[in-house]
């Protein structure tokens, strides 16, 4: 009976965690509806929507990370949840990036003004910190056996490789994800969301054991805030500079190098 009771308790805890994540999604969705109706100033509108989107992403990822730690022997279950919630975020967070790298990409490609970009970046960073403390307050309620507020304030270093490999991992993940984001724009919405969710799941599978495969500076700040405090240079390089480097390389390749290569090839064919 004891193993059965343990299994039942574990199942209840998992369902509670899933319920919390879906509740966050619903609450943020309701808040977005209210914000769209009540906020008419573009700056305030952009700030609030980006804040809510980043809050949703960070809170759900905190809970997903906790679930993955409780089920290390079942990585398929964790990856299934990553895919499912990537779909949920893709469907509900339309028009926001929840990622400073996405804002940087839009600004560098001329799709967003510097002023709007700065507002969105500020919203993401503030939301990342708020989500951390809200998650800690929620965990302190002890809704499940592994919801302990102290967990969110402990530094668990997710970097399991040397600095160079960690930088390459985060840069490559950022490069691949934002390349797909850029080139899937003409794909039908329903298919695009599934493709991006599958890509995110693959990147988490491939890079999760190395750095956590975050490729999002705001999310990294929320997940590993205490680690930033204890080992700032390392975490700044891996989780902020490396994804930004991936964005820069992506833009250089698709906006400059490949067009230049194509033009040279065309000229050579004419000659």
From Swiss-Prot:
UniProt protein name: Aquaporin-11
Gene3D superfamilies in the record: Glycerol uptake facilitator protein
Pfam family, one: MIP
Membrane topology recorded in Swiss-Prot or TrEMBL: Multi-pass membrane protein
Span(s) of short sequence motif NPA: 216-218
Domain of life of the native organism: Eukaryota
Transmembrane spans: 15-35, 42-62, 75-95, 164-184, 195-215, 235-255
Residues spanned by motif NPC: 99-101
Swiss-Prot/TrEMBL domain comment: The NPC motif is essential for oligomerization and water permeability function.
Residues on Lumenal side: 36-41, 96-163, 216-234
Family label: Belongs to the MIP/aquaporin (TC 1.A.8) family. AQP11/AQP12 subfamily.
Molecular function GO terms recorded: channel activity; glycerol channel activity; hydrogen peroxide channel activity; water channel activity
Tissue/organ expression: Detected in the sperm head and tail (at protein level). Expressed in subcutaneous adipocytes. Expressed in testis, kidney and ejaculated spermatozoa.
PANTHER family documented for this protein: AQUAPORIN, AQUAPORIN-11
Ranges facing Cytoplasmic side: 1-14, 63-74, 185-194, 256-271
Quaternary context: Homodimer; disulfide-linked. Homotetramer. Can also form homomultimer.
Keywords, comma-separated and alphabetical: Cell membrane, Cytoplasmic vesicle, Disulfide bond, Endoplasmic reticulum, Membrane, Repeat, Transmembrane, Transmembrane helix, Transport
Catalytic reaction list: H2O(in) = H2O(out); glycerol(in) = glycerol(out); H2O2(out) = H2O2(in)
Function: Channel protein that facilitates the transport of water, glycerol and hydrogen peroxide across membrane of cell or organelles guaranteeing intracellular homeostasis in several organes like liver, kidney and brain. In situation of stress, participates in endoplasmic reticulum (ER) homeostasis by regulating redox homeostasis through the transport of hydrogen peroxide across the endoplasmic reticulum membrane thereby regulating the oxidative stress through the NADPH oxidase 2 pathway.
Species of the source: Homo sapiens
